[in-house]
Each structure stands twice: as C-alpha cells, then as structure tokens.
Amino acid sequence: MKKDIPVKKNSTYNLYITGMGTKGEGIGKINNFTIFVTGAILGEEVEVNIIKVNKNYAVGKLLNIITPSANRVEPPCDIYTKCGGCQLQHMSYKEQLNFKRQKVKDALLRLGGIDVEVEEVLGMENPYRYRNKVQLPIGKEKGKVNIGFYAPRSHNIIDLKSCFIQDEKADKIIKILKEWIEKFNVSIYDEKEHKGNLRHIMVRTAFRTGQIMIVLVTKDKKLPHKEELINKLTEDLEGVVSIIQNMNSQKTNVVLGKESIVLWGKDKIIDYIGNFKFAITPLSFFQVNPIQTEVLYNKALEYADLKGDEVVFDAYCGTGTISLFLSQKAKKVYGVEIVNEAIESAKLNARENNVDNVDFIVGESEQIIPELIEKGIKADVVVVDPPRKGCEKSLLEAMAKMAPEKIVYVSCDPATLARDLGVLEELGYKTMKVQPVDMFSNTYHVETIILMTYYGDKKK
C-alpha cells in the first residue's frame, strides 16, 4: 500500500520542532511525517516552505520563526547562512553543548544498543577564534576576487572578510593577499577550465609560540610579483616566520600538491601541546584546536590511569601526539600508523622531545597486533583514534585477542563510534565512561572519548 505523503513541494506549513538532526537541523512532523529544517531549534514553532520531498521525509526551508527558542542567538557572522563552515551559530553555546551531548547519547543507544551515562560536554571558555589552520579556495566571479569557504553542497566561493572561528591574523593575511591579487592582476585558477595559477591560501598559526606559516598553492612554479607580497606580509604582520609556495598542477579537489618551495623564512613552525613540542610543515597533520586537544589528551591520560609499569598500544598514532602524552606515565608505548610519512614525523617528534620509551611502527594495526602477541608483547591499555569511518572489524577483533584491561577510544563520529563499541561489547568489553569534548565549536561536529574495561575470558 502506497504511503500517503502529507506535504507537497513548494507548499508552506507551520511546524513545531520536536527534535534535532545529527547535522544540527531542526526536526518536526506533520501527520507523523518527518521534516528537516536547517536553522530551526528544538522547541520552536516555525513556518517552512517544502523544497524537497522523499518517500520517508521532506526538507523545509525556514521562512519565519513564529515562536523563537530562548536558546536562539544572533549569529556574529554576516555570511553565516551562506557559508558552509559553521552550522550552529544561531544556538547559544550552552545549547550547542546540550545538542552535542544528546547527539552522542542518541547514537550510542540507537546504533550501538549502549545505554550509558554521557558526561556533560567539555566546552571552551571562548568558542570563537580557536582554529590554528585555515585553507581557502581563491576564485573570480564577474571580475571580482573571492577568497572564502564554499557554500554548502557547491563549489561557489562565499567571499569572507572575517571568519569568527579562525585566528584573527588569518583575516589580515587574506585581506593583504586580496589587495595584492587585485593590484597586480594575479592569475587565478579556474577549476572548471583547469587554467590560471593561484588556487588556495593556507594559514597555519602556532598559538603557543605565535609563529605563522603562509602557504600559497599554485598550479605553476612561476609566481609573478611574489616579492611585493612577501614584503607586505612580513612588514605588516608580526609572527610571520614562513612563506611557502606549494605546487599542485593536478585537476583535483585535493588542496596541496607534493612539491613545496620556501619563498621566505623557515620551512616549518613550532607549536606545543602540553609540554610537548611539534614541528609543523604545510603537509603535517596537527589538531586544529590546540586548546581542546590538550583537554582531550589529558582525559585520555586520565582514562588510561597509568601507574608506570604498563605497556600501551596506540593503534592510529598519526604523528605521535597521543603516544607522546601516554609516554609520560607508561613503561612502553607502541604507536602504529599505516602512513609512512606520519611515522617519520612521529619519530622526529619523539627525538625532539627526548622521549625514548615509544616505538613507532609502519603498518596496519590489525596485522601488527598479532605479530606483537607472537613476540610475547601484550598491551595493558589500547588507545584508538581512528578516522571518521571508524575501526576495521578485524582490528577490533585483534584488540580483543590481545585482551588489554582497558581500551580508550577517541572518536570524531558518534555513529561509527556506536557501531564499534557494539562490536567490542560483544567481544568482552564494557563501556564505562563517555566524555564528549567540544573541539569544533559552532559546528555540528563533536569529539568523544570512551573508556572500556575488559570483563571477558582472558584465555580467548
């Protein structure tokens, strides 16, 4: 029997928002039929125009807020509704944290069958200006230079004068770059035609040391009038220690190419997380919110509860940041990462910080763990910080065979976290603590750190 759909495209309806979607959309129902509304908040009555209808849900465009929520605030950014960078600026920060906590709780219960207390989200004192890295496409439309983020679900560049989640000095750098492009009529890359030269700008700021790296991404090696830009950037701004040109001649959405040349200054900047020093190059992975990264890693250390004689296994060690934190309290840490360049950076970071109780290994953790077991090496604690897609099931099974007393799972996606925890619970682990951390304020993203303890059969 065909399901009757109670709404029609291009029609207008009043709607009560009774829930929130995973990307911060308001959710309401008409005759039990679900409607998603970007920009609406739980508890509001809104007027919407239906712009998309599927058999199980519809999407409504917010036309009018009939009854606003007490948690609604005026977004500070004047391009907030056009830009794809933030999704929650219209919510009070307290409500953003409530939303993120509920998002984690819902995912664990609905997708993992795990009913557990979720702690209040560890938020920021100031939820703005927290990003230490920004990379922006550069384009031209009707003769006007645009530097900014892409509009949602498009490659249309929304020009920005100021971004409230990136470091303020990046705003000044972008302004100088735009003036230079206009003054010298600098060739700008057209991604449709694969013509032109200047593609992206990336700015990396070391919050602790104040050092700034500016990366100009071009299609060609030639960069006319670069001396004028270098002079302006270095004269007008404090902290600039590195200006780099990165060449990317490929027809691709990948921002950085493989070849870089130093135009001025150094080839890296230095920053700290806790007491550890890290060298950052254009291609280095480094957490974009160093303030909350320290909060997150200290929580990982707390959950691991190391006494000094434990062996720890870090299954997605990247450039070694969590491994180094764990090394402070562990007897030995083994860090594994499939990307060779990341392992080389991890080894360098260990040397630079005089850490000698960490071994970094290139490979897949699901293959390395059995090799370590064969050598008689067993972990007391396993830490995983996987990409958004979560862990391979074979890794979870290998971890369970190693049977560590504790697993500390750091996740950037509640859905894949819930799936993986469900698997681990079947393999003999119990979820004990769930702590969300707000790493990406004003966006729908949330980081979560989990403590699991072993209760299964040690002989398996």
Swiss-Prot record:
Alphabetical UniProt keywords? 4Fe-4S, Iron, Iron-sulfur, Metal-binding, Methyltransferase, S-adenosyl-L-methionine, Transferase
Enumerate the residues binding [4Fe-4S] cluster. 77, 83, 86, 163
Family indicated by similarity: Belongs to the class I-like SAM-binding methyltransferase superfamily. RNA M5U methyltransferase family.
User: Binding positions for S-adenosyl-L-methionine?
Assistant: 287, 316, 337, 385
Which species does this protein come from? Clostridium tetani (strain Massachusetts / E88)
InterPro entries associated with the record: MeTrfase_TrmA_AS, NA-bd_OB-fold, SAM-dependent_MTases_sf, TRAM_dom, U5_MeTrfase_fam
Its domain of life reads Bacteria
Q: Where is the active site?
A: 412
Gene Ontology molecular function: 4 iron, 4 sulfur cluster binding; metal ion binding; rRNA (uridine-C5-)-methyltransferase activity
Q: What class of enzyme is it?
A: transferase
Q: Which Pfam families has this protein been placed in?
A: TRAM, tRNA_U5-meth_tr
UniProt EC number = 2.1.1.-
* One GO term of the biological process aspect: rRNA base methylation
Domain TRAM, first and last residues per copy: 6-64
Under which name does UniProt file this protein? Uncharacterized RNA methyltransferase CTC_02481
